[in-house]
Amino acid sequence: GSTFPYNPYPFPWTSHLFQDSPSVAMGIFEGHMSKMAEGFKAVRQAELELAGTYRPEEHDKFFRYFNWQQFSDEEFLLCPPVVAVGGDGAMYDIGFQNLSRMLMSGRPIKVLVLDTQVYSNTGGQACTSGFLGQVSDMAPYGSEHHGKEEIRKEMSLLGMAHRTAYVLQGSISNVTHLIEGYIEGLNSHRPAVFNIYAVCQTEHGVADDAATLQSKMAVESRAYPLFRYDPDKGIT
């Protein structure tokens, strides 16, 4: 990022407390969609007027309360998505309640979770995304303790349990699966959770050029299985 008013990215972004990403995204989404709705409303009203089919008794009330929930598929795809980004500490732990609330709201906000399975930004402490037996800061191995003593929180399964969201669990080792999931999730009218295995070379103790290999081993060993879940595809 950068310091206001400078922006190094080709799109708008905001910085905030790292656990607040989903909550901030909800507010941005409402303002963003309100602005888009004004434009779509003007276009629809003009089309009705030109066709001579505008009926005040029907359309006045409709356009008074017109919002993103009435967008057509074409209109929805014209709206730049609102994307919240966070690591496992932000989304699995301290900000999980914010993420859960956002998913239950049904707002089509997209959340990218970079799952390193440790607190990479504060020194590699253990977190709930790590596996049982993991050795890391705050989860030592010795005569009394044998690494992390808690089982892993499965974010993707929790996302599915909300029954409102598109869920992708992916890895850079399988790029086709990853890109297809991103496209499906971004185009979905639902919230989306992209839970992505992210190698932290320093804390995982692997070489700088070994991220793809490490990701491949995580997938093939079934430690990090790949899947996509779309509630709109029906009962499976």
Q: Where is each model-derived feature located?
A:
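Glycine/aspartate-rich loop-and-adjacent alpha/beta segment that forms the canonical ThDP
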Residues: 6, 180, 184-236
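Hydrophobic/aromatic ligand-binding patch that stacks against planar heteroaromatic rings
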Residues: 101, 158, 184-185
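Short gly/pro/ser/thr-enriched loop/turn and capping motifs at secondary-structure boundaries
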Residues: 116-121, 201-203
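Cofactor-binding active-site loop characterized by glycine-rich and histidine/acidic residues
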Residues: 1-111, 118-120, 124-134, 145-150, ...
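Short, conserved beta-strand edge motifs with alternating hydrophobic and charged residues
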Residues: 113, 169-170, 193-197
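Short catalytic-loop micro-motif centered on adjacent basic/acidic residues
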Residues: 84-86, 166-171
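Active-site glycine- and acidic-residue-rich loops that bind
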Residues: 89-93, 171-179
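Active-site glycine-rich loop that binds ribose-phosphate moieties when present
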Residues: 149-155, 175-179
